[in-house]
């Protein structure tokens, strides 16, 4: 996913960034060298939390892709592309990007529109 770093803050050996993408804005921990504000980066986005269907993940009727900050959490809207019945891992599509999620509970049907929220996101810069 392409993101632009709007700002960053260092504390306790962690780098927290505010980023924007063509789908909206979010907040995440940054892994790697300190990013430059205003620069564009190709990143991999990790959600390390186990998300629960019906609580952290909800079905949506709209078919838009979105990232937004709401009540100190980052909310994503996308399409459920696939899910593993064995371990609950699923792939969510946001435009031309995908996000892998670990989930538990009864999932939506593949190709459903969904919204999920988390307060734990890690961005890794992709090596070119």
How should each PLM-predicted stretch be described?
Residues 9-10, 34, 45-51, 118-128:
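Short, charged beta-turn/beta-strand-edge "cap" motif at the junction between a beta-strand
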Residues 14-59:
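Acidic (E/D-rich), amphipathic helical modules within compact regulatory domains
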Residues 13-17, 86-92:
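Short aromatic-glycine-enriched beta-strand elements
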Residues 20-35, 93-122:
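Beta-strand/loop nucleic-acid-binding surfaces
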Residues 77-80, 88-89, 105-110, 126:
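Oxidizing extracytosolic/periplasmic lumen-facing domains
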Residues 54-70, 128:
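Short, compositionally biased
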Residues 18, 44-46, 79-81, 93, ...:
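Residue-level recognition of well-ordered beta-strand positions that form the cores
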Residues 1-11, 64-86, 112-116:
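Structural detector for short beta-strands of small beta-barrel domains
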């Amino acid at each position: 996913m392409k993101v632009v770093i709007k700002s960053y803050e260092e504390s306790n050996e962690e780098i927290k960034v505010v980023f924007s993408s063509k789908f909206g804005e979010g907040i995440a921990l940054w892994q790697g060298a300190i990013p430059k504000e205003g620069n564009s980066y190709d990143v991999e986005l990790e959600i390390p939390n186990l998300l629960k269907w019906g609580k952290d993940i909800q079905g949506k009727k709209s078919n838009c892709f979105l990232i937004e900050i709401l009540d100190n959490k980052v909310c994503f809207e996308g399409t459920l592309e696939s899910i593993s019945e064995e371990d609950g891992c699923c792939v969510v599509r946001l435009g031309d990007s995908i996000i892998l999620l670990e989930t538990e509970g009864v999932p939506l049907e593949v190709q459903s529109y969904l919204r999920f929220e988390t307060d734990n996101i890690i961005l890794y810069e992709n090596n070119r």
